[in-house]
């Protein structure tokens, strides 16, 4: 009697490289490939274990001298927006969010390029070409969608495919226990709209509507100002050596936003 078994995933370790978040630190990552019939199942398990997806790779930090990167997920069903978040929702009441299959467009890349050039000129993604962007969007073996956020045009009906200005977009995985925001970007000239916050709020709304408990935000790095925004979305859980634990925001310095 022959018994066929699914091969176990193979994990690899990257060479040390400069940390993009904390000066004077070196980063290493452990990673595996998300391919085959169990890719979605593995993505669920690994994301719940602190991994992130990039194309067909799942990775997590494996740094020798630092444990600053902490996986964060919002408890979507308990979430209520703060006063400042309600103002963000009001400021974007003219925005239509539409979900599509993970297919890239030249319009998306143009906005993505503007975002990188303004926000991440020195980052590891700064030299991404249109082909690189297409691979980032399409190279997935899990349930990945792209959500476009467009300005509503005067006289456009809700039943029509929105054609207004593309303001932002989010590449998102739908998992068994939540939504994972893989990558998002927006028009950097529209700072007053707080589009990054708006997209997270919209994903919480989507998770609630789907009955999913979590929205995964990736890693929070205490001491990195560019990551501070993630702790504003309460309640949330952080992945610790003891498992997922509810985060106590009173342990953080007071936020100037509320």
Curated annotation (Swiss-Prot):
This is Aspartate/glutamate leucyltransferase. It is found in: Cytoplasm. The keyword Secreted does not apply. It comes from Rhizobium leguminosarum bv. trifolii (strain WSM2304). Belongs to the R-transferase family. Bpt subfamily. The keyword Cytoplasm applies. Keywords: Acyltransferase, Cytoplasm, Transferase. Its EC number is 2.3.2.29. GO terms for cellular component: cytoplasm. GO terms for molecular function: arginyl-tRNA--protein transferase activity; leucyl-tRNA--protein transferase activity.
């Amino acid at each position: 009697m022959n018994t066929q078994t699914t091969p176990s995933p193979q994990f690899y370790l990257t060479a040390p490289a400069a940390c993009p978040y904390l000066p004077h630190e070196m980063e290493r990552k452990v990673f595996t490939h998300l391919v085959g019939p169990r890719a979605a199942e593995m993505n669920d398990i690994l994301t719940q274990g602190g991994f992130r997806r990039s194309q067909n790779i799942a990775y997590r930090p494996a740094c020798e001298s630092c444990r600053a990167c902490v996986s964060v997920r919002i408890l979507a069903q308990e979430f209520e927006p703060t006063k400042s978040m309600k103002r963000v929702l009001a400021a974007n009441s003219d925005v239509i969010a539409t979900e599509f299959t993970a297919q890239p467009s030249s319009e998306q890349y143009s906005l993505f390029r503007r975002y990188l050039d303004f926000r991440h000129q020195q980052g590891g993604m700064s030299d991404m070409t249109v082909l690189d962007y297409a691979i980032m969007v399409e190279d997935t073996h899990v349930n990945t969608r792209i959500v476009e956020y467009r300005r509503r045009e005067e006289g456009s009906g809700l039943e029509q495919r929105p054609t207004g200005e593309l303001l932002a977009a989010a590449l998102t995985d739908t998992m068994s226990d939540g939504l994972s925001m893989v990558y998002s970007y927006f028009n950097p000239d529209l700072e007053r709209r707080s589009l990054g916050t708006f997209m997270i709020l919209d994903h919480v709304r989507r998770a609630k509507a789907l009955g999913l408990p979590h929205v995964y935000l990736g890693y929070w790095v205490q001491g990195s100002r560019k990551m501070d925004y993630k702790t504003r979305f309460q309640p949330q859980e952080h992945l610790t050596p003891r498992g997922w634990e509810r985060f106590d925001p009173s342990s953080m310095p007071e936020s100037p936003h509320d």
